[in-house]
């Protein structure tokens, strides 16, 4: 059974809230943020203008009709801009007849009728406007002109005969050539113009996906029978020939070596033509930080070999950038970050980035910071990172990554303690890109540091050879609606390389995203993370290498890195293994506003593999999303479902991008 969109939203929200035991909240609470807007108020009464208030009265009151009329109406769109006189107001209304009737026909109402009432005076599509102008003027400097659009959509027309033919042969396509699941039109369906156009686009896309790049729509001919309220529609399509990819040309580079751009293009001449492959190419080339835009253009004709030439047109961005950001949560406190970046250091899209973070380090000695005067120098944590990326070594798909880090950190802030760490770290990796979605990297790491917690102080040196695999088939980095993300890493630190503690640290995370509708307004998202440390006892492992759960990227509602095995004095000391998971329902209410009910669970364990000797902690909450061009602004409120003594009942998180 196909559920309407609003039912999907209700069921998704209700399902997660039932799991978490939350009571539903009135959606009007969001009006506190001003994100749903306020009721329309006409401009103030003035001697120089004639403000009006527009109301749509639709017979039968179908919501989709009223929304379509509002979207098509100039009178509605300009309601906040009062006309200078009654004549201008009436001309606005007259200009609306055509677009509003087009909107009604587009919804399948081909016998629709409508009139405007301006101050009670009827204005028809062919009537003399003099009386309406006179009435509108009588309201000047006295009251707002009431304008009513009375609409009778009539009976919804239905489809009868649907024919799709090959423009070359004028014969209908067979079910094998064009499956009914592509057309998605049947006799008895509403004869909506938007549905007819969407079906035409689907059919063209179907043929293009069959390696027919020149597929095109030739004609669509609807015939309306008013007495029977039926429509026949015939399509004419030219599927075009099957053709492979031809020569691929990169244009638009000025200061960036085009060989670097070419290394991010995984298509080769002779490969089967595929719209998805072209979309992947655009996404892959778009990861080059030195570029601001990427456009994939297809030739209009085939070359002499019957192949389709492809043009990758790029635009470079300013090479230098300075940035600043801030984040805050009620548990983990405030943090600020600044960075400087050069995106094309030597002309090969090399990226040098210098980044500094300053944050309030929570105390783990039982004392609290209650006012500014309580701050001590040790309460300020920070990290400085310098990273360098050299893509496409020698024009290959190998990249060089070098990273240096200096950090002072402290976790804790509640009765469960934490740790203090100081470290300096250096890494060098070679990454090989197998495709636009799959890469592997391996390298060398040296880290010297000191950690201190209830288990004692550890001065350490680790020297290792980390390696990792990454697969990412998602469509958008900050707001994915489909695909998978998988990252698996293993970092051996053997003593024969000079490590003071021999161990192997492994970690894997996976997330998936599934859209329940074609417009991706209802998304189910899930994440799972695993970790393991072998080769060393718990008290030999530096505290910052041990696994903890909790925090904005783990189990929301619990303090950052506060979940794990309990050591002396009842303080959390971290574990040698980790298990965490999250489930979200991302529901768009409007194009810019969404809600996200979620549930998180996780824990760390003393053993090298999760044995559930420690309790899995669970939290749940509700998030608000404000969608922008760069990504959603995220506001999450989370609550532990199995609070420990001292845990806060609610936590607030604000950042850019989805939680995972």
Language model feature labels by segment:
Residues 169-177, 274-486, 555-557, 561-572, ...:
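Gram-negative/organellar outer-membrane beta-barrel architecture
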Residues 2-12:
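Bacterial N-terminal signal peptides that target proteins for export
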Residues 13-21:
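Bacterial N-terminal signal peptides
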Residues 308, 517-598, 606:
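Extracytoplasmic gating/loop element in the C-terminal half of outer-membrane beta-barrel translocons
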Residues 22-29:
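Sec/Tat signal peptide C-region and signal peptidase I cleavage site
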Residues 424-428, 486-493, 501-534:
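Transmembrane beta-barrel strand/turn architecture of Gram-negative outer membrane proteins
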Residues 30-64, 78-334, 339, 353-358, ...:
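Periplasmic polypeptide-binding modules associated with outer-membrane biogenesis and secretion
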Residues 335-337, 427-431, 441, 464-468, ...:
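One-face residue pattern on beta-strands with alternating periodicity enriched for small/polar residues
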């Amino acid at each position: 059974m196909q559920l309407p969109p609003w039912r999907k939203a209700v069921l998704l929200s209700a399902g997660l809230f039932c799991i978490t035991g939350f009571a539903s909240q009135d959606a009007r609470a969001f009006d506190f943020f001003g994100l749903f807007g306020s009721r329309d108020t006409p401009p103030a009464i003035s001697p120089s203008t004639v403000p009006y208030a527009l109301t749509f009265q639709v017979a039968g009151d179908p919501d989709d009709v009223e929304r379509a009329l509002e979207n098509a109406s100039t009178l509605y769109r300009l309601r906040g801009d009062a006309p200078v006189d009654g004549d201008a107001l009436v001309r606005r209304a007259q200009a609306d007849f055509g677009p509003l009737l087009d909107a009604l026909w587009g919804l399948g109402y081909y016998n629709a009728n409508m009139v405007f009432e301006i101050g009670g005076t009827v204005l028809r599509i062919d009537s003399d406007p003099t009386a309406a102008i006179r009435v509108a003027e009588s309201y000047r400097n006295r009251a707002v002109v009431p304008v009513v659009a009375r609409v009778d959509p009539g009976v919804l027309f239905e489809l009868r005969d649907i024919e799709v033919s090959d423009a070359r042969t004028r014969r209908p396509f067979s079910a094998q050539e064009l499956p009914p699941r592509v057309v998605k039109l049947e006799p008895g369906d509403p004869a909506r113009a938007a549905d007819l156009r969407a079906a035409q686009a689907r059919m063209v896309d179907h043929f293009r996906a069959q390696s027919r790049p020149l597929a095109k729509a030739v004609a669509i001919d609807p015939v309306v029978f008013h007495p029977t309220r039926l429509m026949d529609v015939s399509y004419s399509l030219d599927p075009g020939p099957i053709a492979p990819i031809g020569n691929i040309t990169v244009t638009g580079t000025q200061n960036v070596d085009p060989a670097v751009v070419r290394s991010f293009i995984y298509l080769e001449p002779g490969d089967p033509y595929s719209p998805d492959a072209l979309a992947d190419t655009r996404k892959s080339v778009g990861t080059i930080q030195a570029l601001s835009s990427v456009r994939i253009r297809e030739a209009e004709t085939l070359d002499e070999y019957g192949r389709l030439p492809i043009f990758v047109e790029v635009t470079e961005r300013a090479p230098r950038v300075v940035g600043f950001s801030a984040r805050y949560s009620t548990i983990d406190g405030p943090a600020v970050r600044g960075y400087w970046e050069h995106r094309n250091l030597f002309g090969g899209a090399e990226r040098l980035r210098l980044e500094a973070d300053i944050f309030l380090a929570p105390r783990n000695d039982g004392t609290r910071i209650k006012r500014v005067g309580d701050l001590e120098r040790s309460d300020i944590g920070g990290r400085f990172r310098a990273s360098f990326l050299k893509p496409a070594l020698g024009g290959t798909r190998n990249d060089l990554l070098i990273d240096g880090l200096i950090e002072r950190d402290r976790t804790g802030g509640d009765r469960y303690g934490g740790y203090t760490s100081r470290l300096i770290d250096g890494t060098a990796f070679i990454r090989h890109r197998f495709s636009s979605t799959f890469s592997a990297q391996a390298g060398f790491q040296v880290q010297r540091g000191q950690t201190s917690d209830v288990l004692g102080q550890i001065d350490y040196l680790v020297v290792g050879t980390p390696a990792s695999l990454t697969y990412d088939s998602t469509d958008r980095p900050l707001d994915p609606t489909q695909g998978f993300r998988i990252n698996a890493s293993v970092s051996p630190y053997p003593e024969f390389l000079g490590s003071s503690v021999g161990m192997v640290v492994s970690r894997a995370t996976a997330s998936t995203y599934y859209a329940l509708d074609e417009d991706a307004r209802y998304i189910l998202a899930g994440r799972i993370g695993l970790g393991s440390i072998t080769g060393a006892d718990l008290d030999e492992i530096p505290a910052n290498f041990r696994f903890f759960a909790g925090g904005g990227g783990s189990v929301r509602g619990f303090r950052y890195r506060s979940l794990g095995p309990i050591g002396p004095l009842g303080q959390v000391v971290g574990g040698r293994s980790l298990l965490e998971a999250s489930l979200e329902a991302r529901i768009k209410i409007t194009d810019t506003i969404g809600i996200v009910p979620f549930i998180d669970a996780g824990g760390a364990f003393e053993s090298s593999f999760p044995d559930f000797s420690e309790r899995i902690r669970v939290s749940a909450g509700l998030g608000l999303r404000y969608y922008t061009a760069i990504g959603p602004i995220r506001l999450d409120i989370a609550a532990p479902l199995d609070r420990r003594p001292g845990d806060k009942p609610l936590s607030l998180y604000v950042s850019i991008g989805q939680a995972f």
